[in-house]
From Swiss-Prot:
Residues 98-123 form a coiled coil. PANTHER family: ANGIOPOIETIN-RELATED PROTEIN 5, FIBRINOGEN/TENASCIN/ANGIOPOEITIN. NCBIfam families: GGGWT_bact. InterPro entries: Fibrinogen-like_C (IPR036056), Fibrinogen_a/b/g_C_1 (IPR014716), Fibrinogen_a/b/g_C_dom (IPR002181), Fibrinogen_C-term_domain (IPR050373), Fibrinogen_CS (IPR020837). SUPFAM superfamilies: Fibrinogen C-terminal domain-like. One of its GO terms (cellular component) is collagen-containing extracellular matrix. Its main location: secreted. This is Angiopoietin-related protein 5. Disulfide bonds join 310-314, 324-338. Residues 1-25 form the signal peptide. Residues 141-383 form the Fibrinogen C-terminal domain.
């Protein structure tokens, strides 16, 4: 059996022979010997030429393969770089998108959580109110014992038996009619007539002059007794009254402010308030820290009856204010260029403290106003021969 190289050589010789025959046919003037010699020489040359061509082809192939390999390698590197950049860019955009989605979801959850908490607080307050109204314990029943005020009732009935706190009917001097009041008969000897109380925010204190004049709310819960009724109580003859402001913070801290010689001028003077000496641990917010804060000797103001001293406007925390009542969400108070006190402000829940909230600006903690949860204003008779 022939080897591949031998077969190739035989095939090459056959080709050379055929070519030689063709040349011999065209060139008849050459001799046979010359033809044979030429054929042999041509065969030898063809063989050398074939080898040379094979070498050149091999070199061209190797060079082409190297170029192709180099191009393929560069293309792979280029594609890898592009793919890597695309993955990094996609990862970053995906992270940013997910972060934004998570922030939006968290904000929505926080909002819904606050809404649920506020609704739960409202439901709890309403449930408590309904339950309280269903109960009718003896101390809350009006006692048909007409006295001038709660101090008078305490001094009269208390000499015979223990006087419970609750609803009583009083008929102060100067009043043409009797009316019902809540009497605190327990705190520091009792005999205190409650003229205002804030505990849960159920009663709306955003009222006009007529409501603050006659009073509103529930004497067993939140209420404002009324300017006319307060006037009749504190302007009786030969006596004076002490005003006691009881404050409770959201963390259940208690504080108070007390003023002797508390009285009001009549309706023609818009129930201008007068205060005596201060004592307590909550600070004197009625008089404030500056002259323009002083609410003593100021008339009462509401959103429709403006007596707050802002003529035509006053500056409050850098803000131009034309009406303190409007600034405080249309609540009524003895404003003086607004001032530091407003116990009739809007009752806020869950730690909120706004400019319209219940305010006693001199009661502070860590140099910040204390957030007030509940407050009551009580008056007690003081016998004072110098009172006019």
């Amino acid at each position: 059996m022939m080897s591949p190289s031998q077969a190739s050589l035989l095939f090459l010789n056959v080709c050379i022979f055929i070519c030689g025959e063709a040349v011999q046919g065209n060139c008849v003037h050459h001799s046979t010997d010359s033809s044979v010699v030429n054929i042999v020489e041509d065969g030898s040359n063809a063989k050398d030429e074939s080898k040379s061509n094979d070498t050149v082809c091999k070199e061209d192939c190797e060079e082409s393969c190297d170029v192709k390999t180099k191009i393929t390698r560069e293309e792979k590197h280029f594609m890898c770089r592009n793919l890597q950049n695309s993955i990094v860019s996609y990862t970053r955009s995906t992270k940013k998108l997910l972060r934004n989605m998570m922030d939006e979801q968290q904000a929505s959850l926080d909002y819904l959580s606050n809404q649920v908490n506020e609704l739960m607080n409202r439901v709890l307050l309403l449930t408590t109110e309904v339950f309280r109204k269903q109960l009718d314990p003896f101390p809350h029943r009006p006692v048909q014992s007409h006295g001038l005020d709660c101090t008078d009732i305490k001094d009269t009935i208390g000499s015979v038996t223990k006087t419970p706190s609750g609803l009583y009917i009083i008929h102060p001097e100067g009043s043409s009619y009797p009316f019902e009041v809540m009497c605190d008969m327990d705190y520091r000897g009792g005999g205190r007539t409650v003229i205002q109380k804030r505990i849960d925010g159920i009663i709306d204190f955003q009222r006009l002059w007529c409501d603050y004049l006659d009073g509103f709310g529930d004497l067993l819960g939140e209420f404002w007794l009324g300017l006319k009724k307060i006037f009749y109580i504190v302007n009786q003859k030969n006596t004076s009254f002490m005003l006691y402001v009881a404050l409770e913070s959201e963390d259940d801290t208690l504080a108070y402010a007390s003023y002797d010689n508390f009285w009001l001028e009549d309706e023609t003077r818009f129930f201008k308030m007068h205060l005596g000496r201060y004592s307590g641990n909550a600070g004197d917010a009625f008089r404030g820290l500056k002259k323009e804060d002083n609410q003593n000797a100021m008339p009462f103001s509401t959103s429709d009856v403006d007596n707050d001293g802002c003529r035509p406007a006053c500056l409050v925390n850098g803000q131009s204010v034309k009406s303190c009542s409007h600034l405080h969400n249309k609540t009524g108070w003895w404003f003086n260029e607004c001032g530091l006190a407003n116990l009739n402000g809007i009752h806020h829940f869950s730690g909120k403290l706004l400019a319209t909230g219940i305010q006693w600006g001199t009661w502070t903690k860590n140099n910040s106003p204390v957030k007030i949860k509940s407050v009551s204003m009580k008056i007690r008779r003081m016998y004072n021969p110098y009172f006019k």
